[in-house]
From Swiss-Prot:
CDD domains: CYP503A1-like (cd11041). It is a single-pass membrane protein. The gene is atnM. It is found in: Membrane. One of its GO terms (cellular component) is membrane. The chain crosses the membrane at residues 17-34. The keyword Membrane applies. It is an enzyme of class 1 (oxidoreductase). This is Cytochrome P450 monooxygenase atnM. Heme binds at C418. Keywords: Heme, Iron, Membrane, Metal-binding, Monooxygenase, Oxidoreductase, Transmembrane, Transmembrane helix. It comes from Arthrinium sp. Cytochrome P450 monooxygenase; part of the gene cluster that mediates the biosynthesis of the meroterpenoids arthripenoids. The pathway begins with the HR-PKS atnH that catalyzes two chain-extension steps to form a reduced triketide, which then primes the SAT domain in the NR-PKS atnG to initiate three more cycles of extension to give a linear hexaketide corresponding to the polyketide part of arthripenoids.
């Protein structure tokens, strides 16, 4: 091998050309990135930025105000503009649109949900590659849910109820004495078992290692993304391997594959030889404790309906008061402050005159959940609200828990509404039937549950405990 000094090699004409080309390409790429961002900000300059920075301020203040005071930023933005305004999040500027824009963008292909997820969850990082719009996983999951799971809800409902009997016995016990349980912790474990019973069957739904991953993965994913976003974006590909929260996510994915693969192999062999909600459950429980006057009417309804129709998909559909209570609970306390988050894939001018340049993120606030034009006395919790809509032909279609609309976007709205909401609704109802029929419950002494806020995300209080005891002298056969 020739040992040519670096100084001499750089004098070679071919080397100088190669270096110049590399520098030119890097410079062009840098100019394009900076230019694109500058152009985007130039086009958005007409929209108020509620947590903008002063000349000598760092981005930490803006990010901190978003993470810990997002609702205050939304209120400030509403006061400044009724059409649209900007919020600096922990990673990007998001344009918050007026609620009436929901119908306009809901089915517009220029507003991409999958590309938003990829950008939000850093899909270019191997630990988060599941969110990439290019690997087909999103399309596959949607197909499984819409084409396989939703049509089979009638078949899986008995399995859900049977597993609910076992998991409530394990986590809430059969004790007839008052005792305390942590709502968030036990409900997460119960949801994990019920969902795993449907998606994976009995082989894994009671496996402690699998249930631990199922319970912890979403939380670890969230904190992994937040931790990596503390670094400059150009450093993400270099530092992700050394961020403990991100490494934990990658490790859990590998553990999950090791647990699932033997089950998949077994089912493939069987096939050759013979030719898948938690936040909704705990928040609903908190609301039942806050409004205990609904407990007996709900019990009376489920006993009447299940005696007549059994624990079936049809029987669950007939639980009108339960459905209404769940929807009202979600109206008051959804999972986020804004919904219908999208990435704009090409320049768009909305009907209200707001111009959105390609590449910007947008979202719709949930102020419509408290719109007096849509709801009478909107600031009052009314568990019968959607039952009453059955008497209004114009509103009847919107009363169901799984129905989305501009006035109720708990599951989103439009073509990207949550495809798993039908299964989630059935799962929540099965669990509530078991809870209402089998247990007396009340909030433990102490502070009332508070909704925790982290950026846009709303999380039911993880520290809240319930006092529960098993009811006696009841007919449990209606749950079979």
């Amino acid at each position: 091998m020739l040992d040519i000094p670096l100084s001499e090699s750089l004098q070679h004409p071919g080397t100088r050309v190669a270096v110049n080309i590399i520098i030119s390409i890097a410079a062009i790429a840098l100019v394009r990135v900076i230019g694109s961002r500058w152009l985007t900000q130039y086009h958005l300059r007409a929209l108020p930025l509620v947590n903008g920075l002063g000349l000598f301020e760092s981005g930490k203040r803006a990010k901190g105000s978003f993470l810990f005071n997002a609702q205050g930023l939304l209120d400030e933005g509403y006061a400044k503009s009724s059409k649209a305004f900007r919020v600096q999040t922990d990673s990007e500027q998001v344009v918050v649109l007026a609620p009436e824009c929901a119908s306009e963008i809901r089915n517009d292909d220029r507003f991409s949900f999958t590309n938003l997820l990829a950008e939000d969850f850093l899909a270019h990082i191997p630990a988060f590659v599941n969110f990439s719009p290019h690997n087909g996983l999103n399309d596959m999951a949607n197909d499984v849910i819409t084409k396989k799971l939703n049509p089979a809800l009638g078949l899986v409902t008995p399995d859900l109820s049977a597993e609910a009997t076992l998991t409530f016995r394990d986590h809430w016990t059969d004790s007839t004495e008052w005792h305390s349980v942590n709502v968030k912790g036990t409900i997460l474990e119960i949801v994990a078992r019920l969902s795993s019973r449907v998606f994976l069957g009995p082989e894994l739904c009671r496996n402690p290692a699998w249930l631990r991953i199922t319970v912890d993965y979403t939380t670890n994913l969230f904190f992994g993304v937040v931790a990596l976003k503390k670094w400059r974006s150009f450093l993400h590909p270099l530092v992700w391997r050394f961020v403990p929260e991100v490494r934990k996510v990658r490790q859990q994915i590998e553990e999950a594959i090791q647990l699932i693969q033997p089950v998949v192999d077994k089912r493939h062999a069987e096939s050759r030889s013979s030719a898948a909600s938690s936040g909704k459950k705990d928040q609903t429980l908190y609301d039942l404790c806050s409004y205990p006057e609904y407990i007996e009417p709900l019990r009376d309804e489920l006993v009447t309906v299940l005696k007549e129709s059994g624990m079936t998909k049809a029987g669950l559909f007939k639980l009108k008061l339960m459905d209404s209570f769940m929807k009202e609970s979600q109206r008051f306390k959804p999972g986020a402050m804004i919904m219908m988050r999208r990435k704009v894939m090409e320049d768009v001018t909305l009907s209200n005159g707001v111009f959105l340049p390609r590449g910007v993120q947008v979202g719709i606030p949930l102020r419509s959940h408290f719109n007096p034009k849509a709801y009478s006395d909107p600031d009052k919790f009314d568990g019968y609200r959607y039952v009453k809509m059955a008497d209004d032909p114009e509103k009847e279609v919107f009363r169901h828990f799984v129905t989305t609309s501009q006035e109720h976007m708990g599951f989103g709205f439009g073509k990207h509404s949550c495809p798993g909401r039908f299964f989630a609704a059935n799962e929540v109802k099965v669990a509530l039937c078991h809870i209402l029929l089998k247990y007396d419950f009340k909030l433990a002494e102490g502070p009332k549950p508070n909704v925790m806020k982290m950026g846009w995300v709303l999380i039911s209080d993880p520290m809240t405990n319930l006092m529960i005891k098993r009811r006696e002298g009841i007919d449990e056969s209606i749950l079979e």
